[in-house]
């Protein structure tokens, strides 16, 4: 009897293992998981198309409405190369005509080498503009890229002694009305108010904010807002792209 038990127990264990393997194989074949490439990509829920109505900053003063250009290929295996000189050289290279002055329309296209890239007028769902999700959702390159961003901030009056506060992943430079305001170099994570500009003046009416963000491997995003002398966010601004390009 003991001999039969010693023989039967291992056999039963083997049969039990085989039964589980067959069960799980049948389960997987009945409901195969969709491969990543089979899943339709979208920029939702991170972005939605900007409307013609002026948009105020969010509750903390962050600018969420931007014209974003699809990413320009700029291969980099590491973000450690993003020194002052490297980043400035990358952004001073002319990839498309009037890149430092153009105020595009939604849907405008530019030619960069063999890339045809479009501008998109979008509202970010978050305080930080998720460039990686923007590129991924449009089936564009996500690593080793440069993003250009433009927005138009309308001020109800002249505002003196304000500061532009920005954070980005990875390196970036930001301009206000054609003048460089802040620069962020090296391999860095996106941190709120990571770098703050010197005191500057917002004109009554239209002010053009322009930025360029470069990244190698990893996620890309940025956040931008204006703060006053006390470091408090300036909220009585609006962003409107309905006159972009005019």
Positions of PLM-derived features:
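N-terminal secretory signal peptides that target proteins for export/translocation
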Residues: 1-13
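Bacterial N-terminal signal peptides
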Residues: 13-29
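Accessory carbohydrate-binding/adhesion or oligomerization-edge regions at the termini
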Residues: 31-129, 211-246
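Short structured motifs
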Residues: 133-137, 148-150, 193-197
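Short beta-strands within extracellular/lumenal beta-sheet-rich domains
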Residues: 142-154
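Non-cytosolic beta-sheet module surface loops
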Residues: 155, 164-168, 213-215
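Aromatic-lined ligand-binding clefts that engage carbohydrates, nucleic acids, or primary amines
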Residues: 160-175, 209
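Beta-strand-rich ligand-recognition modules
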Residues: 176-225
């Amino acid at each position: 009897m003991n001999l039969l038990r010693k023989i039967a127990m291992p056999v039963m264990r083997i049969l039990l293992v085989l039964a589980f393997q067959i069960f799980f194989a049948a389960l997987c074949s009945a409901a195969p998981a969709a491969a990543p490439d089979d899943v339709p990509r979208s920029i939702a829920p991170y972005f939605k198309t900007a409307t013609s109505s002026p948009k105020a900053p969010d509750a903390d003063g962050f600018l969420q409405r931007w014209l974003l250009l699809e990413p320009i290929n700029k291969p980099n295996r590491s973000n450690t190369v993003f020194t002052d000189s490297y980043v400035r050289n990358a952004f001073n290279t002319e990839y498309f005509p009037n890149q430092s002055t153009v105020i595009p329309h939604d849907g405008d296209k530019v030619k960069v080498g063999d890339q045809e890239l479009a501008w998109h007028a979008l509202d970010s769902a978050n305080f930080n503009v998720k460039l990686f999700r923007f590129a991924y959702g449009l089936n564009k390159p996500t690593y080793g890229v440069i993003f250009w961003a433009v927005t138009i901030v309308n001020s109800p009056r002249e505002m003196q002694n304000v500061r532009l506060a920005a954070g980005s992943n990875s390196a970036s430079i930001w301009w206000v009305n054609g003048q460089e305001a802040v620069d962020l170099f090296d391999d860095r994570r996106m941190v709120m108010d990571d770098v703050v500009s010197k005191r500057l003046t917002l004109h009554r009416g239209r002010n053009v904010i322009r930025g360029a963000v470069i990244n190698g491997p990893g996620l890309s995003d940025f956040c931008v807002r204006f703060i006053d002398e006390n470091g408090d966010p300036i909220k009585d601004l609006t962003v409107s792209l309905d006159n972009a390009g005019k």
